[in-house]
Design a protein with these regions (language model features):
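Short, charged surface segments at domain edges that flank catalytic/cofactor-binding sites
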Residues: 1-24, 104-105
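Short Cys/His-centered divalent metal-binding micro-motifs
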Residues: 29-33, 60-87
Length: 143
């Protein structure tokens, strides 16, 4: 099985997730300055193959390479980590969305719109940072 193709929507979504977290790992809080951001990933709890939640803000977070690898290798800890952030009810909804194939078909049809939406969100977040806003910024999800 080949790697999952990274679309322009994936790039825009990743930029939003990482910039909203101030270019820092949301687990260990390591900051990644401009020019050194390759080690900071947009981590998906349910993998990108689940198109229904591929671009769902609650399914993603900014993690450094080390934390991403560690949580990926320890799924029970990853679940606990996400549960502490979102709670049981939100995790149940996320799982239902992950398994909803109609959501996946819709996302595939609207991938260009999704890319545009997250490019605009990235610009909004960038402007908020220029205006002096600090801390995690809420991302307006496409769905």
């Amino acid at each position: 099985m080949g790697a999952i193709k990274r679309t322009p929507a994936d790039k825009a979504f990743s930029d939003c997730i990482r910039s909203a977290a101030e270019w820092s790992c949301e687990r260990c809080h390591t900051y990644y300055p401009e020019g050194g951001r390759m080690g900071l990933h947009c981590s998906h709890y349910h993998g990108r193959g689940k198109w229904g939640i591929r671009f769902c803000v609650e399914n993603a977070e900014s993690l450094c390479y080390g934390c991403h690898q560690y949580l990926g290798a320890h799924p029970y800890l990853h679940t606990d980590h996400k549960m502490n952030i979102h709670g049981q009810a939100a995790m149940d909804i996320l799982r239902e969305k992950a398994n909803d194939t109609s959501l996946g078909r819709m996302a595939k049809r609207e991938v260009k719109f999704i890319a545009k939406h997250y490019r605009e969100e990235f610009k909004r977040i960038h402007q908020l940072r220029l205006d002096g806003v600090i801390g995690k910024i809420e991302i307006n999800s496409w769905s």
